[in-house]
Regions:
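Residues lining hydrophobic/aromatic ligand-binding pockets adjacent to catalytic sites
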Residues: 94
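Hydrophobic or amphipathic alpha-helical targeting/insertion segments
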Residues: 1-2
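Outer-membrane beta-barrel and related beta-rich outer-membrane complex signature
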Residues: 18-28, 85-89, 161-163
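Exposed, low-structure sequence patches enriched in small/polar residues
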Residues: 57, 62-88, 97-191
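A subset of solvent-exposed loop/turn segments in beta-rich extracellular surface proteins, enriched
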Residues: 17-50, 98-103
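Amphipathic alpha-helical scaffolding segments
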Residues: 13-17, 81
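Outer-envelope exported proteins of Gram-negative bacteria
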Residues: 8-12
């Protein structure tokens, strides 16, 4: 056929651990002033217990795509809201980090199959204008040999707290590179 459209919506609201600045009494924003998010999951010290479930985190968005047998093209939008304003002390090393109470990320993705080749990629932009992109190709050259190449470029000011794209570091920011891979299965017993 001519293809079809697919739509997916998502939403989440939960309490998360965060360091609250209790000394900030002059803040004019709604909600507490947050100095950082806690990601360890530990609640064994007094400070960690104070940080437990300190603020509400809300995520919402959707993805729409057009799909045919060989082509998929989509767009994604995601919006995040935090129950307080993140007000980190910005230093040289973190000057481009997210420092607000909400963020929107928009993106477009594609995948094209042609014979034994799969070309794919995604481009994304955060609310502050930071961009991230990756593009790749997988090739099945033979039943025993496959080849892959992936280019990635995550700008220093890209802000997406939940992204988990292919990267060297744990965050998808300030990184550019190319990955090349070869998979070989010389015999049918090769794992």
């Amino acid at each position: 056929g001519l293809g079809k459209f697919e739509f997916t919506a998502f939403g989440s609201r939960k309490k998360i651990d965060a360091n609250i600045n209790h000394e900030d009494t002059l803040s004019t924003i709604d909600g507490p002033s947050i100095t950082s998010f806690q990601a360890t999951g530990f609640h064994t010290t007094v400070g960690e217990l104070e940080d437990k479930d300190a603020i509400e985190e809300t995520h919402m968005g959707g993805h729409a795509r057009f799909v045919t047998r060989k082509l998929s093209v989509g767009v994604t939008g995601a919006h995040s809201i935090y129950g307080g304003n993140l007000e980190r002390t910005l230093q040289y090393y973190n000057q481009f980090d997210f420092n607000s109470n909400q963020n929107t990320v928009m993106g477009a993705d594609y995948s094209l199959l042609h014979q034994n080749f799969n070309f794919f990629g995604e481009v994304s932009r955060s609310a502050n204008g930071g961009m991230a992109q990756l593009h790749g190709m997988l090739a099945s050259l033979d039943p025993k040999l496959a080849f892959s190449v992936l280019y990635r470029n995550y700008e220093k000011d890209y802000q997406s707290l939940l992204s988990t794209a292919f990267a060297e570091s744990s965050r998808n920011v300030n990184e550019k590179g190319v990955f090349v891979g070869i998979e070989s299965k010389p015999t049918k017993y090769w794992i």
